């Protein structure tokens, strides 16, 4: 099930980024101790009461023909297009402006829920000065103060009231839900077409739960797959291709609905920072991952080329050290058969459970080989561990003091668990918890 997307829209300097940071709080920072992943602050996740959602901050829209403003407006339109609910922000101190009215006209055409937020209402006496904003035609304005955090509860209540109840994907539990992600022009579309043309049976094209997404069902060697949002991967256009910050919205929706994510790289162009950012989304969502190096046919190769490229990937994607790597050519339909065993194994490991007794034997042996650390004279004591979840496999380790388990020792225990049980293709989570 995908989380709703909330876009914050308005002219410059009305306080959009301040409200964005208020809503997402510390979630704007990266998952702790995840080296090598960068997170763009323009997009993050938020929580309100029982609701999880994604929120996107957009650039300020102005009445100008400046070239950069054309790009900002295009980016905002993409964010609006992908959003389920829009927060339209205005500024009480500056009053209603012509630009506000222009943005309102743009939002009328979307036929989407719009919640009007009047920012910089820093004390109750100022609430009487917001009535001019009724003229924008979006109903009751919600007075807020980004700098003081006032009024956010009422605003988010109204935002959440506009979330649609979305049903889970109606796919069999054994069906592997698969998405492809990667920066523009790495060959995702070609890979989709090549996969669907490789000894497959297409069952049907059906509408996914994500608005206007098309999923494609197919089978390979008695395993059913669903390729999530093939329409999104095939969607072209200079605006989407050139505004990567915003076009990731659709990719993130696909990731949320997937079991396994194929991170597609370009063998010819090599690895760039954007590749790591895109891959980081799949890792942070806890999805099983297979790294796919496409366009392998374009390289002049010798016996060492593949090993050198793999070493480079391991160096650049340290946070994905669990992910297997496949080298393929979608264009030439080379080595595509190597993908499916990796996808299937990653999916199985993503759902794997281990017995507590065997797990604790592994933990005990690990501690005997490498004793727990000390800090200021206090030694970490590990009492026992248990698996509490799958997708991804998640383990709680009960200890005397959770703060004594440093990242390096947590990583050591993870490696020992991997050595004992496998888990190739899936992240695993280890949560230290103080025993009561």
Curated annotation (Swiss-Prot):
Transmembrane segments: none
InterPro entries named among the record's database cross-references: G_ENGA, GTP-bd, GTPase_Der, KH_dom-like, KH_dom-like_a/b, P-loop_NTPase, Small_GTP-bd
Binding residues for GTP 1: 10-17, 57-61, 119-122
GO biological process: ribosome biogenesis
SUPFAM superfamilies: P-loop containing nucleoside triphosphate hydrolases
GO molecular function, one term: GTP binding
Superkingdom of source: Bacteria
Annotated GTP 2 binding sites: 182-189, 229-233, 294-297
Domain KH-like: residue ranges: 352-436
CDD domains reported for this sequence: EngA1, EngA2
Domain EngA-type G: 4-167, 176-351
Keywords in alphabetical order: GTP-binding, Nucleotide-binding, Repeat, Ribosome biogenesis
Family (UniProt): Belongs to the TRAFAC class TrmE-Era-EngA-EngB-Septin-like GTPase superfamily. EngA (Der) GTPase family.
Subunit structure: Associates with the 50S ribosomal subunit.
Protein name: GTPase Der
Organism the protein comes from: Staphylococcus carnosus (strain TM300)
């Amino acid at each position: 099930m995908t989380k709703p997307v909330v876009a914050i829209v308005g002219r410059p300097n009305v306080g959009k980024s301040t409200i964005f940071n208020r809503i997402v709080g510390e979630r704007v920072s990266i998952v702790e101790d995840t080296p090598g992943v960068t997170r763009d602050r323009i997009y993050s996740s938020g929580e309100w009461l029982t609701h999880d959602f994604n929120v996107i901050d957009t650039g300020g829209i102005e009445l100008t023909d400046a070239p950069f403003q054309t790009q900002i407006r295009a980016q905002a339109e993409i964010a609006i297009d992908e959003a389920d609910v829009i927060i339209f922000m205005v500024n009480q101190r500056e009053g209603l402006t012509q630009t506000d009215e222009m943005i309102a006209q743009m939002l009328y055409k979307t036929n989407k829920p719009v919640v009007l937020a009047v920012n910089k209402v820093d004390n109750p006496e100022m609430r009487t000065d917001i009535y001019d904003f009724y003229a924008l035609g979006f109903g009751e304005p919600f007075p807020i103060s980004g700098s003081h955090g006032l009024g956010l509860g009422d605003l988010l209540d109204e935002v959440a009231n506009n979330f649609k109840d979305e049903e889970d994907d109606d796919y069999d539990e054994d069906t592997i839900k698969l998405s492809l992600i990667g920066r523009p022009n790495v060959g995702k579309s070609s890979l989709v077409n090549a996969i669907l043309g490789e000894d497959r049976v297409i069952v049907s094209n059906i509408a996914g739960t994500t608005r206007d997404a098309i999923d494609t069902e197919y089978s390979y060697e008695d395993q059913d797959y669903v390729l999530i949002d093939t329409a999104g991967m095939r969607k072209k256009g200079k605006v989407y291709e050139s505004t990567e910050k915003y076009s990731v919205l659709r990719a993130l929706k696909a990731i949320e609905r997937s079991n396994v994510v194929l991170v597609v790289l370009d063998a010819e162009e090599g690895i760039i920072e954007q590749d790591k950012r895109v891959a980081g989304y799949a890792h942070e969502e806890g999805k099983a991952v297979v790294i796919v190096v496409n366009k392998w046919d374009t390289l002049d190769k010798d016996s060492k080329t593949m090993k050198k490229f793999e070493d480079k990937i391991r160096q650049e994607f340290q946070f994905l050290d669990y992910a297997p790597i496949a080298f393929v050519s979608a264009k030439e339909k080379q080595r595509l058969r190597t993908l499916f065993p990796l996808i299937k194994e990653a999916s199985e490991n993503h759902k794997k459970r281990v017995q507590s007794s065997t797990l604790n034997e592994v933990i005990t042996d690990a501690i005997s080989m490498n004793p727990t650390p000390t800090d200021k004279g206090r030694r970490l004591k590990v009492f026992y561990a248990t698996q509490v979840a799958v997708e991804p496999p998640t383990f709680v380790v009960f200890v005397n003091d959770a703060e004594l388990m440093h990242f390096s020792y947590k990583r050591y225990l993870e490696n020992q668990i991997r050595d004992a049980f496998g888990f190739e293709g899936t992240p695993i989570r280890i949560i230290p918890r103080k025993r009561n």
